Amino acid sequence: MNNMLDIWQSRLQEHIKETRTYMKYMLNDHLVIVLIFFLAGAASWYSKWIRDIPAHFPSFWVMAVLFSLVLTSSYVRTLLKEADLVFLLPLEAKMEPYLKQAFVYSYVSQLFPLIALSIVAMPLYFAVTPGASLVSYAAVFVQLLLLKAWNQVMEWRTTFQNDRSMKRMDVIIRFAANTLVLYFVFQSVYMYALLVYVIMAVLYLYMSSAAKRKTFKWESHIESELRRKQRFYRIANLFTDVPHLRKQAKRRAYLDFLLRLVPFEQRKTFAYMFTRAFLRSSDYLGILVRLTIVFALIIMYVSASPLIAAVLTVFAIFITGIQLLPLFGHFDHLALQELYPVQKETKLKSYFSLLKTALSIQALLMSVASAYAAGLTGFLYALIGSAVLIFVVLPAYMTTRLKKHGKL
């Protein structure tokens, strides 16, 4: 037993040390300053919106859905490694202390998003709930903590199943149950909430019984752990080089016509390589598309001010540009690129050419969203602000960043 606990403590210390190392680079970045200003602006807008909530706004449903998303995303960090399939497999019968510690750590470490959302939702709760008090909200928060534990246990039980459809069904059922029970809890309709709680208890008993007849899925847990680490590495790689990051590429043959737009010339060597990496890597094109869609929707359905629409547009483009910074070093592992008869200045020029093209397309789409929300004035503000950022600010800023990290 002590050996398994020692292994867990060693893994946990290693995990925390690695996380702190990368967080040091992430939190020291200028991006934090931008985020602070953005959060300050969002807080100001939120406080004004709370004072004048539209009568038709479904406040209880919105709170229930947002909390359900956080609760349903529960999981257990086992910190298992690929080698454990060989060295710890013979000790499977003695893994219980290790897994209990993993469960406790996962529960505590995942409380931060729940606490943060609870703080953000508190003004909305008091604004729309008749007779609301700190005691009533504290009662809601206690139930959120219990629901978090229930979701984590249920997710853990599904890891013993081989059927992927059952795992998908588990997520759907848990999300629906969380949403319903919280909708009733926020309105203090505990008669219906109790009924949902009973159903959730039955589901817990069923999944616990089903899990007892299954074995521990080593491959599945190790794969899940590696996937979560790679997800963190991808985020950290936006700020510093991460040697453990595994690159993934997708064919995307339907985008080949864009590659044909790059002239077949020696001076366009890196232009072709950067374009190919941008289109086929799982990191770059996806980031551009996701951020464009998310911020465009925020602008269209939240902002009616031309200035706010322009600020959101510039912020989205800045965030996207920063996250595309690792593209410049995408081929650093290829030693042969040093032999290419192409000057380094040409490589930098090719990178900025692609970056400006991609961000200009994003800026145009975001400006259209600004026009939808704030008219022609919003369109012009967003377009002008984006142009200054893309063609003046970002090139200078990113050149400095590349020199700082020894890329130039």
UniProtKB/Swiss-Prot annotation:
Topology within the bilayer: Multi-pass membrane protein
Transmembrane annotation, as ranges: 30-50, 53-73, 111-131, 134-154, 180-200, 284-304, 308-328, 351-371, 374-394
GO CC, any one term: plasma membrane
Signal sequence, start to end: none
Pfam families to which the protein is assigned, alphabetical: EcsB
Localization in the cell: Cell membrane
Keyword Transmembrane helix carried by entry: yes
InterPro entries (UniProt xref): EcsB_ABC
Keywords annotated in UniProt: Cell membrane, Competence, Membrane, Sporulation, Transmembrane, Transmembrane helix, Transport
Gene disruption: observed consequences: Cells form colonies in which certain architectural features are absent or less prominent than those observed in wild-type colonies. The Ecs activity could be important for the development of communities.
Keyword Transmembrane: yes
BP GO annotations: establishment of competence for transformation; sporulation resulting in formation of a cellular spore
Function field: Presumed to form part of an ABC-transporter, it may form a transport channel.
Name of protein: Protein EcsB
Organism whose genome encodes this protein: Bacillus subtilis (strain 168)
Gene name tied to this protein: ecsB
